[in-house]
Amino acid sequence: MAKGFYISKPVGILAILLGVAAVCTIIALSVVYSQEKNRSTESSTAASTAAPTGPTTTVATTLDQSKPWNVYRLPKTLIPDSYNVTLRPYLTPNNKGLYVFTGTNIVRFTCKESTNIVIIHSKRLNYTSHQGHMVALSGVGGFHPQPVIVRTELVELTEYLVVHLQEPLVAGRQYEMNSEFQGELADDLAGFYRSEYMENGVKKVLATTHMQATEARKSFPCFDEPAMKATFNITIIHPNNLVALSNMLPRGPSVPFGEDPTWKVTEFETTPIMSTYLLAYIVSEFSYVETRAPSGVLIRIWARPSAINQGHGDYALKVTGPILDFFSQHYDTPYPLNKSDQIALPDFNAGAMENWGLVTYRESALLYDRQSSSSGNQERVVTVIAHELAHQWFGNLVTLEWWNDLWLNEGFASYVEYLGADFAEPTWNLKDLMVLNDVYRVMAVDALASSHPLSTPASEINTPAQISEVFDSISYSKGASVLRMLSNFLTEDLFKMGIASYLHTYKYGNTIYLNLWEHLQQVVDKQPTIKLPDTVSAIMDRWILQMGFPVITVDTQTGTISQQHFLLDPQSVVTRPSQFNYLWIVPISSVRSGSPQAHYWLPGVEKAQNDLFKTTANDWVLLNLNVTGYYLVNYDNENWKKIQTQLQTDLSVIPVINRAQVIHDAFNLASAQKVPVTLALNNTLFLIQETEYMPWQAALSSLSYFKLMFDRSEVYGPMKRYLKKQVTPLFNHFERVTKNWTDHPQTLMDQYSEINAVSTACSYGVPECEKLAATLFAQWKKNPQNNPIHPNLRSTVYCNAIAQGGEEEWNFVWEQFLKAELVNEADKLRGALACSNQVWILNRFLSYTLDPNLIRKQDVTSTLSSISSNVVGQTLVWDFVQSNWKKLFQDYGTGSFSFSNLIQAVTRRFSTEFELQQLEQFKKNNMDTGFGSATRALEQALEKTKANLKWVKENKDVVLRWFTENS
């Protein structure tokens, strides 16, 4: 699944400051072009009830662990072999106003250990009685006696259908369970659900799926665990005018449905052996564009007919073939299927989902329009496609054994998405962006005492809610970061060879992370060049089995190098033990005054010494070249001063990525009280002559924390003046490069730098920027059919107009939002609507999030996050969340990956005793309701608030003085 959109999957690929000066208030709205990894698993809840009163009952039990149906993991007694599933979705409501689907399922399974209980997952399905029971059971091959059912029951808490038998099943024999059922085709974005959209003023309804991680059971009864692989024969009964899609191609043309000639039946080819969470089927009237890869694989891009007719699927079609071919070569394994369908859905909770052969996307992650999509939108499309196609091998062909190793699936895809996208767009330098989008992004979370290791014991991940929590930035971005580090010190060639060996060995099977280490070790052992200080397993286990990461400290006077577990709050208490005592085996690259040095390994000890890190009076050293290692670097004060001098005299001597590193690391070290905050601020002085994107983005991301802490205090005035001074040369640079904004930069990085220049200049009151934005918006408002604003600058211009305007400007943008046909444009407009500095307008906007006809369910949490990023809106959203917590939790709390992002967003300004007390009271008040997938985020918010409170008390005066002196 794609990184959340992360909206998260903020989280993001491109963070753009959208804040703009208003008459009394400067509002900066962060808009994140990101691959949000929203999730859609749900946990069930049930009260205890009495024992069953009849042969077939629906019962919710207490968790008496001696009963196998009260254990969340399936017993190993039965293993599925195949499913024959027929489903019929009704896309008009019944006489009760409900949308439903009906279905039948025949699951064949093998008995591995004799048992008199059949346990299979089932969620919110109503069964048609078979001789008084919910299912029928028979032996395969006609052996006797046939199984006799005593009773069947549904266990709501563990989401099981339980079949109690008179006699045990026989080990080694196959059985078939037959069921007929009905479920609701709800609009909850989970399992088999419905999506709605408007086409030419007419409401259209489609049926689609999202199974990961525990929602296949909501569509039909199944053994819903990733290691319970089987083959699937899917048949869909659907209206004549609609098309049905699934993981495989149809066996042949659709045939009339005998009971009703207005319906037809589409039967699909048998799937390879696969996991339930990768199943997909869709019924819609969508159109497509198609091509064939050189290998012969059929490639189709599906979307609303109007989107296809306008060419919005063409870019995805263009890059899919090259990316598939790249991964076939990269993995040394052919694409396993004969077709690759990708479909853009109007309602989709995740950024995308890697269903085998039928990948589902948010529209913003698949559709691109040259006229109205920004460079960030285009980058998102190619990287999300690469992420999902990477999964077709790593995740689908070879699958994790259990969700505790989710990082192996998602971390790998989050790393190689940059490789696949770079192959499709080789001039964009996309691989460099991983440092900003993943490494630095996840360090902010991994530096908390409440973080968690990449891999945890399987016994700690059981319930659907626990599984949902694993879908976080640690699994995605830290997983990607440490795999990138591993690939770097092994070399990419050895890494690829190990991956290919791993895939060849375990194809159609399941693995744990140790299997990957074994195959990488095998390729290391077969060559003489790369020498490691220990085995791959010994090195990497320290990075995945203990949380956090080290800060490497260098004393250039003595050449001493040391490591320490880095914590943003040095007073926080780490309660999670580590078998490695929070020491890592660290690969260290370095340069001396611009010249590369030999590679060095810091073994799993606290301190070592090497002359590589010892300097003379005129030398400086810089560690972690291009940030290939997952760690921070600190230096003695003298070396820091030399680096600062180098940056202010000739910054080109230090690579671009490391110019970003110097800024990022220093601000984090200052937060942890390892360097003075003035040192970190001094590292931004060179920006007055910097035009590259990455250093500026690192600075803006770091200084955004200062803004959050101080935009309600007297510090903000001098801070605004300083940033205005620093960004003005960058704004003037792009004014010249673009010939007074009549042209646009050629390279992607320069385009991103231009976006930062304009958004930051407008945010901090550069008059020329404000005039530019106002002029462009006025031209558009005068002629709405002809938008003169370049897509790259629209978010900034829209936000500026809303912040400086009133109800008229807000209503105009709202009208354009309602009319927007391309979701990328709608997202820009929706984000800008949060920029208002008028409380009543923001409260009205908040109320719209409760109406799915105004704000789609998939967009609610991101809309709330956008409003909370506005200094005026933050308190409003916090009050809104507290007042509406039960409804928000009911709608999004049990599965949505973005739900945890909402908690993070609404609390990120918290830095006072009162706000800490409010947060603690909020936790206390809602213990009965619960926090679902935001449980860990709430604990992290409490930890961050305490750290913020302490940091502001200690640094406010010195920061005020520094900005005053340097502005």
UniProtKB/Swiss-Prot annotation:
It is found in: Cell membrane. Signal peptide: none annotated. Glycans are attached at N38, N84, N126, N233, N338, N626, N682, N740. It catalyses: Release of an N-terminal amino acid, Xaa-|-Yaa- from a peptide, amide or arylamide. Xaa is preferably Ala, but may be most amino acids including Pro (slow action). When a terminal hydrophobic residue is followed by a prolyl residue, the two may be released as an intact Xaa-Pro dipeptide. The active site is at E388 (proton acceptor). Disulfide bonds join C762-C769, C799-C835. Residues 1-8 are cytoplasmic. Residues 67-967 are annotated as: Metalloprotease. Residues 33-967 are extracellular. Residues 670-840 are annotated as: Interaction with FCoV and TGEV spike glycoprotein. It is a single-pass type II membrane protein. The chain crosses the membrane at residues 9-32. The modification Sulfotyrosine is found at Y175, Y418. The keyword Cell membrane applies. The keyword Membrane applies. One of its GO terms (cellular component) is extracellular space. Its EC number is 3.4.11.2. Broad specificity aminopeptidase which plays a role in the final digestion of peptides generated from hydrolysis of proteins by gastric and pancreatic proteases. Also involved in the processing of various peptides including peptide hormones, such as angiotensin III and IV, neuropeptides, and chemokines. May also be involved the cleavage of peptides bound to major histocompatibility complex class II molecules of antigen presenting cells. May have a role in angiogenesis and promote cholesterol crystallization. Belongs to the peptidase M1 family. PANTHER family: AMINOPEPTIDASE N, PROTEASE M1 ZINC METALLOPROTEASE. This is Aminopeptidase N. It comes from Felis catus. The gene is ANPEP.
